[in-house]
UniProtKB/Swiss-Prot annotation:
Its EC number is 6.1.1.10. This is Methionine--tRNA ligase 1. It holds the Pfam family tRNA-synt_1g. One of its GO terms (cellular component) is cytoplasm. Residues 560-660 form the tRNA-binding domain. It comes from Bacillus cereus (strain ATCC 14579 / DSM 31 / CCUG 7414 / JCM 2152 / NBRC 15305 / NCIMB 9373 / NCTC 2599 / NRRL B-3711). A motif ('KMSKS' region) lies at residues 310-314. GO terms for molecular function: ATP binding; methionine-tRNA ligase activity; tRNA binding.
Length: 660
């Protein structure tokens, strides 16, 4: 491939727009952006894809809660996501939305092809389903399974820890097992396909070796998605819908496949470790079935955690990237994300660590080196950078060799997606250059006219290393390098290119420096740590401190209370009552009998939410008809600020147990 037509295709996951993005989402996207910028600087024709996965049950439910259409709901959130990426200088080349016709039309074609060739078939499915993850699990995959004897009756998702429910419905299935041997052979022939290596072992041992079951690829319990061609009661599920974005965005399956032919297969899919399975098992198998090339690499990064675990609004520990950018600048955040956590491992965000990185690395090391250099050139040479000469002082050659070695380390680290290592190498060069100042002591050289040549060499070397440092930082930081070049007086773009790093001393003699403000001001540690902590707390749900006093209920005797019969009941099923927005018709198991009750909780619970719940039922109420439906009791709920919440029990008591 010639220099002019070498291509590089990198993708992030397409994000699920169910709420505001946090620093964890920014982490993936900044990493992809750094890689895209690096490859562009190396002369590659880069295509950097990101986007949003906008279909599914969660989106539909959230939209219904807000009484708006799912499309209106996702349009609003996607606008916010795009604003965030603009604020973070994310240089994506395309933003794919799964609600766009260019995507949906091709997904329909892909699904039909897979049906026509026998890879997808129609059957009935029963399995454990997590609404939060929109994923089915086998009972062997469940965490904390709930048992009744030797039978699994519930449990939690292994991915998110949310409750699962037993779902039985008609579904289309993908014959996964048909491709297992080919997939394992592909792993063997392409040992670097899954990175880090530990993820590959996890996929083989946890998912493939236990037996890869056929995969449900359609749903009938919601309708927000791409319809199955010829059977519109089915919605194409996330595996075929969302994963296909990587080729639909390139125009695959359309009249214009120019981008697809140019960029596919992808050089790297960047994904979070929680979705490795989908990208390294399901997606390769789908591509095999379509007889398409597989991506060259899937790189699974870790999570940015907090001291108390994953970010959660309920914990009050969510870090909003916008808050950090507005106060500390974009580069401070980008640097922290890429330097603090080795890509592929989990890392812990702390306010203290964030402020320390700014003060020690950015302000002290880099900022101070630039300030000292520009100030000395201004003082000793009237602001003009002297001509570069090699080996004038005994320390010059060592510094130049260190800089050249740093370039090799950075390039090697970037090829391995080791952003933290690359930045660490650059900062070693910054430290070595600060040491060079101490070794050469320009303030001493300036006192002796006979040392004028040495002093000039020191200034030229400092300016040159800062030029190289600025260039090597350009994939990672999008603001500071330009400020560095401005203070060094560099205006020729050729002197800021990656290619120019192979030429030592290319700053023209007489280039005028321009003193400026510190590119990274030092921060007051205690003040800023407290500020960040307060911002994190503000992400927690607001708690009302004071409630209005409610009217006291009329006093009753204990005998009056005992007239009410309360029993534990389990919800077997629920469905909306026709022409009644607030009512659900609920079937209950009371141990010795089944009953139907009608309850006004439809605005707060979906039928899927209720199935399997243990509730408290008033069982000796006189039966009544509500909207034509018989109600044989009442389930208890509490109300706060117009929101209902069902009363429940904290022990798994048998159905029918009397509440005393």
């Amino acid at each position: 491939m010639t220099e002019e037509n070498k291509s590089f295709y990198i993708t992030t996951p397409i994000y699920y727009p169910s709420g505001k993005l946090h620093i964890g989402h920014a982490y993936t996207t900044v990493a992809g952006d750094a890689m895209a910028r690096y490859k562009r600087m190396q002369g590659y024709n880069v295509h950097y894809l990101t986007g949003t996965d906008e279909h599914g049950q969660k989106i539909q439910k959230k939209a219904e809660e807000l009484n708006i259409t799912p499309q209106a709901y996702v349009d609003n959130i996607v606008a916010g996501i795009k604003e965030l990426w603009e604020k973070m200088n994310i240089s994506y080349d395309d933003f794919i939305r799964t609600t766009e016709d260019r995507h949906k039309d091709v997904v329909e074609k892909i699904f039909k092809q897979l049906v026509d060739q026998g890879d997808i078939y129609l059957d009935e499915y029963e399995g454990w389903y997590s609404v939060q993850d929109e994923t089915f699990y086998t009972e062997h995959q469940l965490v904390d399974p709930i048992m009744e004897g030797d039978k699994v009756v519930g449990g939690k998702s292994p991915d998110s820890g949310h409750d699962v429910e037993l779902v039985r419905e008609e579904s289309y299935f993908f014959r996964m097992g048909k491709y297992v041997d080919r997939l394992l052979k592909f792993y063997e022939d392409n040992p670097h396909f899954i990175q880090p290596e530990s993820r590959k072992n996890e996929m083989i041992n946890n998912f493939i070796k236990p037996g890869l079951e056929d995969l449900a690829v359609s749903r009938t319990s919601f309708d927000w998605g791409v319809r199955v061609p010829g059977n519109p009661k089915h919605v194409i599920y996330v595996w075929v819908d969302a994963l296909s974005n990587y080729i639909t965005a390139l125009g695959y399956g359309t009249a214009n496949e120019e981008k697809y032919k140019k960029f596919w297969p992808a050089d790297v899919h960047l994904v979070g470790k929680e979705i490795v399975r989908f990208h390294t098992i399901y997606w390769p198998i789908i591509l095999m079935a379509l007889d398409l090339p597989l991506p060259k690499k899937v790189f699974a990064h870790g999570w940015i955690l907090m001291k108390d675990g994953k970010m959660s609004k309920s914990k009050g520990n969510v870090v909003d990237p916008v808050t950090l950018i507005d106060r500390y600048g974009l580069d401070a955040l980008r640097y922290y994300l890429l330097r603090e956590v080795p890509f592929g491992s989990d890392g812990v965000f702390t306010p203290e660590g964030f402020v320390e990185r700014i003060n020690f690395d950015l302000a002290n090391d880099l900022g101070n080196l630039l300030n000292r250099t520009v100030a000395m050139i201004d003082k000793y040479f009237s602001g003009e950078i002297p001509a570069f000469k090699a080996n004038v002082t005994e320390f010059d050659e060592t510094l130049v060799a260190f800089a050249q070695d740093t370039l090799k380390k950075v390039e090697e680290a970037m090829e391995n997606m080791e952003f933290s290592v690359a930045l660490g190498s650059i900062w070693q060069l910054v430290s070595r250059t600060n040491k060079y100042i101490d070794e050469t002591q320009p303030w001493v050289l300036a006192k002796d006219e006979n040392d004028r040549e040495k002093l000039a060499s020191v200034m030229a070397h400092l300016a040159e290393v800062l030029r190289q440092t600025g260039i090597m930082l350009m994939p990672f930081l999008t603001v500071a390098p330009s400020k560095m070049f401005a203070q060094l007086g560099l205006t020729d773009e050729a002197h800021k290119s990656w290619e120019s790093l192979s030429t030592i001393g290319c700053i023209p003699a007489g280039t005028k420096v321009e003193k400026g403000n510190p590119i990274f001001p030092r921060l007051e540690m205690e003040v800023e740590v407290e500020y960040i902590k307060e911002q994190m707390k503000s992400s927690a749900p607001k708690v009302e401190e004071k409630k209005e006093e409610e009217p006291k209920a009329e006093e009753i005797t204990i005998d009056d209370f005992f007239k009410v019969e309360l029993r534990v009941a389990e919800v077997l099923s629920a469905e909306p009552v026709k022409k009644a927005d607030k009512l659900l018709k609920i079937q209950l198991d009371l141990g010795t009998e089944k009953r139907q009750v009608v309850s006004g909780i439809a605005k707060f619970y979906s039928p899927e939410d209720l199935k399997g719940k243990k509730v408290i039922c008033v069982t000796n109420l006189k039966p009544v008809k509500l909207r034509g439906e018989l109600s044989q009791g009442m389930i208890l709920a509490g109300e706060e600020n117009g929101v209902l919440s069902l009363a429940s029990i904290d022990q798994n008591l048998p159905n029918g147990t009397k509440i005393k």
